[in-house]
């Protein structure tokens, strides 16, 4: 199967602009019904906001933790809706990963984010363009906005937010350029390993 190729097409220090431009690209995408959300939560308040927004969301330690005596993996098993701040703070930072139906929750998720790295992924299929020899590639195509990051795969924290277009595992620079032009942008460097 392999991974998509992810082309960065916008970098900005304004999260709202990144989200808005990603949504403009989504208008060109034959979207799947589900959207992937991920976030690094650094405060108890952020955890509570996300728990209220995404009841039943999957929370886990950002970094692997092991028991100092047994060496076994320590799972995160607190109920984030009932744990007090002190209990939550002992486990921070936490990761949230959730697949949700496309809809209003995605915009609310973007507004509720804190300063940790986060991403929204819209998977789907770019339309076929026979004249340009572009075929949609459903396992690979899509749009991703990464908040506080410049890598399609998790990387270092940055001040900036990056929008990626994902295409076939073989890459499609021509399509990426056309998609970037749709939002008044351009391809900003080499293709990265995508989803």
Question: Where is each model-derived feature located?
Answer:
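Structured alpha/beta or helical-core interaction and ligand-binding surfaces enriched in interleaved
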Residues: 1-195
């Amino acid at each position: 199967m392999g991974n998509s190729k992810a082309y960065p097409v916008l970098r900005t220090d304004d999260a709202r602009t990144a989200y808005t431009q990603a949504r403009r690209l989504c208008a060109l995408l034959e979207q799947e019904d589900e959207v992937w959300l991920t976030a690094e939560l650094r405060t108890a308040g952020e955890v509570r906001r996300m728990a209220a927004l995404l009841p039943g969301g999957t929370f886990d330690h950002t970094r692997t933790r092991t028991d100092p005596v047994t060496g076994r993996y320590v799972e995160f098993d607190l109920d984030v809706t009932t744990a007090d701040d002190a209990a939550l703070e002992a486990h921070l930072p936490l990761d949230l990963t959730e697949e949700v139906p496309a809809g209003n929750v995605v915009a609310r998720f973007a507004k509720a984010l804190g300063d940790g790295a986060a991403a929204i992924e819209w998977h789907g299929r770019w339309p076929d363009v026979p004249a340009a020899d572009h075929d949609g590639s459903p396992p690979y195509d899509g749009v991703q906005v990464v908040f506080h990051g410049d890598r399609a795969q998790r990387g270092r924290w940055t001040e900036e937010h990056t929008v990626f277009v994902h295409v076939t595992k073989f890459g499609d620079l021509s399509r990426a350029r056309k998609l970037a032009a749709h939002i008044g942008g351009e391809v900003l460097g080499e293709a990265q390993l995508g989803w």
